[in-house]
Amino acid sequence: MRSTRPMVNRRDFVARAVSTGAYLAFPHVAPPFEFAEATVAALQARMTAGTLTSRALVSAYFARMALIDRSGPALHSVIEQNPDALAIAASLDAERRRGRVRGPLHGIPILLKDNIDTGDRMATTAGSLALAGQSAPKDAYVVERLRAAGAVLIGKTNLSEWANFRSSRSTSGWSGRGGQTRNPYVLDRNPCGSSSGTAAAVAASLATIGVGTETDGSIICPSSLCGLVGIKPTVGLVSRSGIIPISVSQDTAGPMARTVTDAVVLLGAMTGVDPQDTATSASDGKSFPDYTTFCKVDALSGARIGVARNMAGFHPLVDAAFNGAIAAMRKGGATIVDPADVPTVGKYDDAEMDVLLYEFKDGLNAYLARRGVRTPVNTLEGLIAYNRANARREMPWFAQELFERAQAKGALTDERYRTALASCRKLARDDGVDAVMATHRLDAIVAPSNGPAWPTDHVNGDRFTGGNSSVAAVAGYPSITVPMGFAHELPLGLSFIGGAWTEPRLIGLAYAFEQLTRARRAPRFIPTVTEA
């Protein structure tokens, strides 16, 4: 019998769904993938058993990139594949057959943010067309460490161009070279940045694990918005040599992964004292080759957790998830100190920007000179001129006022710079994290990592509803974000913040919280949501 119900065409269905806040899942159905959500340990077990090779695994990830990164959902997260990855994987397979296994990363495919030097056939460009086609002469120290550990570098990831330090009106995840990276959870939402490509790619199982970098928020925010664990280490735990710089006082590389265990396996391989980065000398005796020993399910029991209420309150759905996370930690045996506010939050913002502008000019000019970048783009001044000459390709949406403000700064001997740096350290360290931790005898401070992902908007730029990376970033202290829930299909993260070199304690707390809540779920490549 023919139905008497009115026919609804596709356009009307979409309109009705949008009007009710429903999500629309039908346009992008990712094909089944054997290694979706696969952990480092699970892949190692298969390679040890002889049922999987590293070369086959790399091939599978490359095939998945073709299906969902360059077509289908078209995430645009990987800016370049390593043309030598299959050969490297085959060589590591041969080592395994001879009985040599370098460690837990042997044969594991990994992606790197495209501001980390690799002395191979891949370019290192910070997403800028100015450096397109230019390879670095040698590996960054952290890349040397990863290769030595047996990791297979399968590609470079897109990023917010110049790690989001070109314009205050930028759109996270966009670069002139790589275009716009999309959030795999809801495709019209932003992945945050600047480690946008690493976050989207790892979330979508385009690699097992990935490396990002952070000056302020560039690991924590994209990890939070893409449902990942992200670790922003103490400055000096991981070398910065061979990484395109913004700030010598705040920059660090860090792991991004789908689980705490995978993130800390990667962290252990990244640490080490590097003579080319004097900040790492302070890590001697404070780093560990195996951070998985701190992953204990009972780590919350007896811990004192401070709730930074003045770092919440920016979104009702985030607050609801945050309160649920606090309840879970209490259930796990933690003593909750609520509130344990950080009184200096936001008071260092102007000083931080001054510090970053000074340090960016000094650090970038030194980096470009050391790397031997071809003229005329071998100085900040030359890059500014290049962008002006190529504005249609490099500046279609936003300009370069941060570049120009940095170029106007003087040397790091300027009194204004030294005063700003001292102010940042006092406000974020002495009167900030250190004071709160000591006053309340805390093991960690917790806060929501960020608000929900916003719609990507190239005309108006990013629309952050809130974020809490700055206090740890300005202090140079560690922070770990762990999935804590969702706001209408959009992932939300919980940040654990501590004092210098407290990674072991934070890792334990983050792991126990992860195991207690199991809040992460894989992305479904939904085209849009209309709420949150």
Pin down the residues of each PLM region.
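N-terminal secretory signal peptides and thylakoid transit peptides that target proteins
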Residues: 2-21
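Gly/Ser-rich catalytic/binding loops embedded in alpha/beta enzyme cores
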Residues: 23-26, 31-216, 234, 258, ...
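Short helix-loop capping/hinge segments that flank enzyme active sites or metal/cofactor-binding pockets
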Residues: 107-126, 293-308, 357-429, 434, ...
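Flexible glycine/proline-enriched surface loops and loop-helix/loop-strand junctions
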Residues: 125-128, 182-186, 194, 244-252, ...
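Glycine/threonine-rich flexible loop motifs
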Residues: 126, 132, 315-316, 454-462
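Structural helix-boundary/capping segments
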Residues: 148, 152, 203-309, 323-332, ...
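Short, surface-exposed loop/helix-turn segments at secondary-structure junctions
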Residues: 440, 452-470
